[in-house]
């Protein structure tokens, strides 16, 4: 099946609804992906890219339904990665002498994957052109390290279509091809996820390369990407977003992520978040347990944030493995213009938080004070966590904080209500976790100020997951 992109340009790619892992298991493609290949039929017939190698046979068969393979005059490979050029071996077995136009670096990559140095390679550089008849040309633009050394874009004159390779794409599968036909919220979420997780390390190259392309003064009516939608409605909107994202991007947002062995570090994360929100209600705060969350969603939130707080328990004097792995990945992504703070709990010996602070600094984050707690944090320790959050909110504020005494008044009233109206704290008889009515249990939607009698019957202890029936009134408060 083919789809008309514009005039004599047809999409002949492959949708992949089922793919859930990309680049090994490093990128979760929760909404599938597509491998976009384009057939241009002018006086000369040109195929731009192929599809992922696992669809090689289907691709060649479908292409054969569109055109006699012997009538393909040129093959353009914008990128040699296997999700772009994976079907080359299957295709070239049918038309082995067809010229392949690509960068010099692409020849090395293609031969490294396909092992056919005898293919008819033709090296192109920025500004080189290829006449395809009917007054039209292909213009080639090298884009090294966006995101491989071999990468390039191809522009078709006359139709004013930019075949942009990985740039401006997204791992997003939909039966509709064009950007104005799909769910806009989904689309732009996937665009940002794609940029944050794949292109962020190369942000310093994005702006000059876009500027170079714009310097050709060529009209762009469409941007035909290698993955996801074709931008036909206001195609420059995604270009403008890339320029914004490449410029040390941040929002008024803080991301907290952690791993924990006994929920102690989780308790710290919750209290820190409470302190941040109490001091700066304008800032968006998101908390993730790395063991239970989509890693790429965490990294996308880090990309959006002005700062991150990373928490870990201490295990064998070092940080938890999932935290170590995620920090290593952040190092590779080379985030800029972001602050960080490390926190965590430990038992008889620490070490993880200091190690984590060093790793975050090495990753390029501007470091703020770290925070440690021994064993399970008690009420005093949790208050220190909240105060840490308040201080973070003050230090990281992008604008002057609101001058208000509301929080102070509310805090005084809540404190009075805790002792006068909310009843005693309750302690789990199994693990000793304490429910404080003044603080509630946000992870189970129990709001601060909820007395034990109003806590839902399906409440479970956050530590041992047992029900309300194992709780007793805290001994020190029993009458």
Swiss-Prot record:
Homotetramer. It comes from Escherichia coli O6:H1 (strain CFT073 / ATCC 700928 / UPEC). Pathway: Nitrogen metabolism; nitric oxide reduction. Residues 254-393 form the Flavodoxin-like domain. Its main location: cytoplasm. InterPro entries: Anaer_NO_rdtase_flvorubredoxin, Flavodoxin/NO_synth, Flavoprotein-like_sf, Metallo-B-lactamas, ODP_dom, RibonucZ/Hydroxyglut_hydro, Rubredoxin-like_dom, Rubredoxin-O_OxRdtase. Fe cation 1 binds at residues 79, 81, 147, 166. Fe cation 3 binds at residues 428, 431, 461, 464. PANTHER family: ANAEROBIC NITRIC OXIDE REDUCTASE FLAVORUBREDOXIN. In the N-terminal section; belongs to the zinc metallo-hydrolase group 3 family. This is Anaerobic nitric oxide reductase flavorubredoxin.
